[in-house]
Amino acid sequence: MTLLPKTHVGAMCAALGIGFLTLSGSILAQDASPTLEPGADIFDPAVAEATPIPGVETFEVESAAHTTDPVEYPQDPPAGGPHDPSWQRCAVYDAPVRPENAVHAQEHGAVWITYEPDLPESDREILTQLAENQPYLLISPYPGLEDPVVASAWGARLRLDDVSDPRLTAFIDRYAGNGPERGATCDTGVETTIDEG
């Protein structure tokens, strides 16, 4: 049996270690998400529809243009479309917010939960609790809402009769952070509200 000098053993261990790290890095890199080309659309509706949530309506969003003009949206409340250059900060509001600002937040990945202004306080408290530790949730009253609660995201909407419906949390889990500008902030932005009358 031939023994190698200690210096050779150390060099071999170092080479094996580097080789292992290189191999591990290659394996990890292969498991990572693919790198997107600059300008690629990172919002993939197919991912959002992988396991359908009963009652979710999906929409093809025609435009994401910025405008300072009021927008008439095909859905009420809106689920994407042209929007104000300023996004609404994701938070819980006691008064309605401008849809054009909320839609910009949806583009960043926000789920906008709207509710009837006369929703009981106990139900509003449940909605407020949902917003804890969820940076992509925007909650506000919405005058004229046809359902007690509606959750809207970019290209998707869920109408609900009850804030405790488990589909609401499933919708948030599915769509929060999944907008065309995924990764854009929602914890800053405008905080203005509008008058109901």
Language-model-detected regions and their locations in the chain:
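Helix-rich interaction surfaces within compact, conserved domain-sized segments
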Residues: 126-129, 133-197
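Mid-length scaffold segments of soluble, non-membrane domains
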Residues: 85-86, 91-132, 137-138
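Solvent-exposed coil/turn segments that connect beta secondary-structure elements
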Residues: 76-78, 116-118, 144, 154-157
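Surface-exposed, low-hydrophobicity interaction/linker segments
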Residues: 40-103
